[in-house]
Amino acid sequence: MVLSIRSQIIIGVVSSILLTSTILAIAYILMWFNGHMTLTLTLTTIITSCLTLLICSIFINPLIQKIKQFNIKTKQFANGNYASNDKTFNSPKEIYELNQSFNKMASEITQQMNQIKSEQQEKTELIQNLAHDLKTPLASIISYSEGLRDGIITKDHEIKESYDILIKQANRLSTLFDDMTHIITLNTGKTYPPELIQLDQLLVSILQPYEQRIKHENRTLEVNFCSEIDAFYQYRTPLERILTNLLDNALKFSNVGSRIDINISENKDQDTIDIAISDEGIGIIPELQERIFERTFRVENSRNTKTGGSGLGLYIANELAQQNNAKISVSSDIDVGTTMTVTLHKLDITT
């Protein structure tokens, strides 16, 4: 049975009266006090206890009301009403401190809930946009496949063009699936073991798949080492993905026949390596340069059939960089080009 504060006080006062009366009765039986004195002491005890109860009630009633209000407040919060409640309790001290602690907890939980809702909304929009992006290449693949199957496309140059489109759309689908996979695994806390990296060999493995595309688009790609860089420890898998995404971005947003430069430099004082990928593309206006790594920004502004993909490459690259002891910075001029620089911190591997 759970008793209220008022009930507990009343029980305490009544118990005090009964205990005092019992002691006085025993004292009377033992003839420590005469009858008149015992009666006087008993009445005095009862009157004093009643006055004490009255005074306690005067002070305790406001406290009880505050506790009831605080209880209502906590129930509303427990039921999902996270609206701000500015009601404060200035006294007594314990109630004030309890209210302050609750308000702090409520504020933190509200922020977390809002963040969760925002992230959930972003994920929903992201999935919807990716689903929309998947429809376009699939529709194109189905259309050209049916045309080839049914004999609608018969001329040699049309057949070759159709195969080129099918390959292009299949590659686009592959990129979309890669982006979806990386988005799913970004926040899973997956870790990668540090590996000894020889940078020239790493770049060869990254650039090799682009060889045919660079030749086909009549581009020039140059890799420049400012100095000889010794092997160092870093997270190879995320680094490969970061550089691949930045290179993809440079190729997407620059014209056929343009130049791509990769410049590598080392800062031995800070124990860092800079890998700068520069293009001669359309550039990025200054007010958008800080937003290009946002997930929603890229989804909203890069979804088009010309560039392909989901527009999430820079977001994925930046997230991987932050998670793996690296940083990406951007420098760009409109109609001149963009330079994306990855700054790697060499890992200190102690045995």
From Swiss-Prot:
Q: Name one GO molecular function term.
A: phosphorelay sensor kinase activity
Disulphide linkage map? none
Name all Histidine kinase domain ranges: 129-348
Q: Where is this chain's protein located in or outside the cell? A: Cell membrane
Q: What class of enzyme is it?
A: transferase
The superkingdom of the source organism is Bacteria
Q: Which residues cross the membrane?
A: 9-29, 40-60
**In this chain, where does the modification Phosphohistidine occur?**
132
Per the record, membrane topology reads: Multi-pass membrane protein
Residue ranges of every copy of the HAMP domain listed in the record = 61-114
Q: What modifications follow translation?
A: Autophosphorylated.
Cite the EC number: 2.7.13.3
Q: Name one GO cellular component term.
A: plasma membrane
Taking the first listed entry, what is the main subcellular location of this protein, grouped into a coarse class? membrane
GO terms classed as biological process? cellular response to phosphate starvation
InterPro entries given in the database record: 2-comp_sensor_kinase, HAMP_dom, HATPase_C_sf, His_kinase_dom, HisK_dim/P_dom, HisK_dim/P_sf, Sig_transdc_His_kin-like_C
Catalysed reaction(s)?
Answer: ATP + protein L-histidine = ADP + protein N-phospho-L-histidine
Q: Which Pfam families match?
A: HAMP (PF00672), HATPase_c (PF02518), HisKA (PF00512)
Which CDD domains does the UniProt record give?
A: HATPase, HisKA
What are the protein's UniProt keywords? Answer: ATP-binding, Cell membrane, Kinase, Membrane, Nucleotide-binding, Phosphoprotein, Transferase, Transmembrane, Transmembrane helix, Two-component regulatory system, Virulence
Q: Which PANTHER family match?
A: PHOSPHATE REGULON SENSOR PROTEIN PHOR
What's the stated role of this polypeptide? Answer: Member of the two-component regulatory system SaeR/SaeS involved in the regulation of staphylococcal virulence factors in a strain-dependent fashion. Probably functions as a membrane-associated protein kinase that upon sensing the appropriate signal, autophosphorylates and in turn activates the cytosolic response regulator SaeR.
Q: What is this protein called?
A: Histidine protein kinase SaeS
Q: Which organism is it from?
A: Staphylococcus aureus (strain MRSA252)
Q: Which gene encodes it?
A: saeS
